[in-house]
Amino acid sequence: MKLEYDLDTYLEKINNNNSYFQTFINKDSLAAGVLVLKPGEEDTQTPHDSDEVYYVISGDGFLKIKDKDYKVSKDKLFFVAKDVEHFFHGNTKELKVLYFFGGPDS
């Protein structure tokens, strides 16, 4: 079982693929990964089956949760309950975010 993860490895995978996110832990009880949005890039995620926590590594913009926009900036944390509509938008700088699910990434 892998216990150590190098975030730069997963950021490079995103840079080399057509995806804007990379899940690097995907267990029954927990999933974790990183999301990178370039300025103006669309976040196409849909509601998840598990609660989720976001940690903003860098960048700016907004996280829309239901009908409210929350300002995104470095070192902010956000909680999104399962099955709740949410997405990042309006970033003028590259946005890097760690995400954690209370269950598998589905």
Question: What would you call each of these model-derived segments?
Answer:
Residues 18, 33-48:
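Conserved short histidine dyad/triad with adjacent acidic residue
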Residues 82-106:
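Ligand-binding loop in jelly-roll beta-barrel domains
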